[in-house]
Amino acid sequence: MFCEPKNLVVLRQLSRQASVKVGKTWTGTKKRAQRIFIFILELLLEFCRGEDSVDGKNKSTTALPAVKDSVKDS
């Protein structure tokens, strides 16, 4: 799966490296393109973490709520 922990580390590293390059070397159109790339990387990172981009709250990671055992043995 794309959102495995090792891939999240790679996404963070790419985002940081891209941020440094924007500040030091690129200008004009290239800088704008790289900022878009950084934005996309950060969106992917938020998606993989399960964060909601609208309100910043974490989404529930459980598929179904826990079921209580209502049947008791006699």
Swiss-Prot record:
Pfam families: Polyoma_agno (PF01736). The modification Phosphoserine is found at residues 15, 19. It comes from the Viruses. The modification Phosphothreonine is found at residue 29. It is a single-pass type II membrane protein. GO terms for cellular component: host cell nuclear membrane; host cell plasma membrane; host cell rough endoplasmic reticulum membrane; membrane. Its main location: host cell. The keyword Transmembrane applies. Residues 1-35 are cytoplasmic. Keywords: Host cell membrane, Host cytoplasm, Host endoplasmic reticulum, Host membrane, Host nucleus, Host-virus interaction, Ion channel, Ion transport, Membrane, Phosphoprotein, Signal-anchor, Transmembrane, Transmembrane helix, Transport, Viral ion channel. Signal peptide: none annotated. Residues 53-74 are extracellular. GO terms for molecular function: channel activity; DNA binding. Phosphorylated by host kinase. Phosphorylation segregates agnoprotein in cytoplasm, whereas unphosphorylated agnoprotein migrate to the nucleus. The chain crosses the membrane at residues 36-52. One of its GO terms (biological process) is monoatomic ion transmembrane transport. It is found in: Host cytoplasm; Host nucleus membrane; Host rough endoplasmic reticulum membrane; Host cell membrane. Alters the structure of the nuclear envelope by interacting with host CBX5 and disrupting CBX5 association with LBR. Involved in the perinuclear-nuclear localization of the capsid protein VP1 during virion assembly and maturation. Plays an important role in the release of progeny virions from infected cells and in viral propagation, probably by acting as a viral ionic channel in the host plasma membrane. Allows influx of extracellular calcium ions in the host cell. May contribute to viral genome transcription and translation of viral late proteins. Homooligomer. Interacts with VP1. Interacts with large T antigen; this interaction may impact upon the activity of T-antigen on the control of viral gene transcription and replication. Interacts with small t antigen. Interacts with host CBX5; this interaction induces the dissociation of CBX5 from LBR, resulting in destabilization of the nuclear envelope. Belongs to the polyomavirus agnoprotein family. This is Agnoprotein. It comes from BK polyomavirus (strain AS) (BKPyV). The lineage of its organism: Viruses, Monodnaviria, Shotokuvirae, Cossaviricota, Papovaviricetes.
